[in-house]
Amino acid sequence: RLGLAYQLSSATRFGAAYSFRSRISDMEGDATLTAIADGIGQIPLEGKIKIRDFQMPAKLVVGASHRVTPQWMVTADVSRVFWKEVMKDIKVAFEANAGGNLNILLPQDYRDQTILALGTAYALSPEWTLRAGARFASQALRKGTLFAVIPAIPTKHLSVGFSYAV
């Protein structure tokens, strides 16, 4: 990961960061695959599962914060997540202990995603700070390609909170 921060003035800061695409080896483990046979029902098959070339995407973030008053700060950042290069397909292989292999290709066809995040913080006292934010994102998943193993990425959400300094 690479990043930089620059203080434009006593009240305004700018930052940028780039996270590189992951380089993770194939994920492997033990699994039970359940086959369903007509008239027999469920047949558990013990074996090994491998998820091939599953990677996390590169990400670029540019943001700024500005202290409007000593108590009140506003922030904004824009992110670009490069899903397209890592989430075209999910490749799964299963090798049953009793023999036999199964290779599955799960099409995902993700698009790159742009995210805008806005936030604010207000210090009620040296101890208490109120916070709020909003996030707006383009949809990375194409309609009809949502696969339950991969969580959907919310395109809009709001958050509120507080902190207490000890």
Task: Describe each region flagged by the PLM.
Residues 1-166:
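Outer-membrane beta-barrel porins/channels
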